[in-house]
């Protein structure tokens, strides 16, 4: 087997994991391990390096789209993996092997990473996914249910916000500025106390906000934080009881509480920008 932390270039059979003791000729025996992460690529406009931070266990083969690949053995530590792209172009990222043992994937805020988030469907142990600032697309419902932390702010992902109900282990999520289309309502999981939910600038309607507050109040989670400020609707009196119940359980809720346009009677005094005011409960 590979030595601890050892990497080894593989042959043209890219995506194949090499394992077992070396034979007399110095070659490695080959086996195909189940699982693939494909469908992501780097759109390199300015030549230079691109990096990922990964964590997990097991063995994978990484192909950065430059015609070569290398093997990595994880040891449950956060590590950076880097490729240098000397020319502009599209470079497909392919990871094969024991991808079901990857626990963290961080694009390190690269704005040249593109592709569909369904690429992560085989990463069934994935706990932390940071893709903020990238150009990834796709429905958030396609992500694995194992997630603890999810950062997709300012990406092109979409879907019903009710998909958050698919993540029972969630502790922190940020979907700010994405293309998520409303909230249809769902039975939310019993999340751990202290969960952080950030859904700013999603253009949620007043009805969406009210329903989300009702569904959160129906859980027993305490001391959470919900940020639904920015470019979202203003909650109505229909959610007053839910709002009060959450505040009594220690929740901090940041939401739009007043709208104003010049010449409108609906101005909330003290609003510095004459557009909206936010409150924390």
What kind of feature is each model-predicted range?
Residues 151-187:
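Eukaryotic tandem repeat interaction scaffolds
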């Amino acid at each position: 087997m590979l030595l601890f932390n050892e990497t080894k270039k593989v042959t043209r059979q890219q995506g194949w994991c090499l394992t077992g003791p070396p034979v007399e000729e110095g070659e490695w025996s080959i086996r195909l391990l189940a699982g693939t992460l494909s469908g992501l690529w780097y759109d390199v406009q300015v030549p230079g390096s691109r990096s990922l931070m990964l964590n997990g266990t097991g063995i994978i083969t990484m192909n950065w789209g430059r015609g070569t690949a290398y093997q990595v053995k994880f040891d449950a530590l956060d590590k950076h993996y880097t490729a240098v792209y000397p020319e502009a172009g599209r470079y497909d990222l392919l990871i094969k092997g024991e991808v079901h043992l990857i626990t963290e994937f961080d694009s390190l805020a690269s704005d040249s990473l593109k592709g569909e988030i369904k690429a992560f469907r085989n990463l069934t142990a994935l706990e932390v996914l940071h893709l903020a600032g990238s150009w990834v697309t796709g429905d958030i419902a396609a992500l694995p249910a194992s997630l603890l932390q999810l950062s997709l702010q300012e990406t092109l992902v979409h879907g019903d916000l009710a998909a958050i109900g698919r993540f029972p282990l969630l502790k922190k999520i940020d979907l700010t500025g994405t293309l998520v289309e409303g909230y249809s309502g769902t039975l939310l999981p019993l999340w751990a106390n202290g969960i952080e939910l950030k859904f700013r600038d999603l253009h949620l309607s007043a009805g969406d906000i009210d329903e989300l507050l009702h569904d959160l109040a129906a859980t027993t989670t305490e001391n959470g934080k919900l940020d639904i400020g920015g470019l979202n609707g203003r909650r109505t009196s229909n959610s007053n009881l839910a709002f009060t119940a959450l505040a009594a359980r220690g929740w901090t809720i940041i939401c739009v509480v007043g709208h104003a346009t010049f010449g409108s009677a609906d101005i909330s005094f003290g609003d510095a920008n004459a557009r909206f005011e936010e409150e924390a409960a």
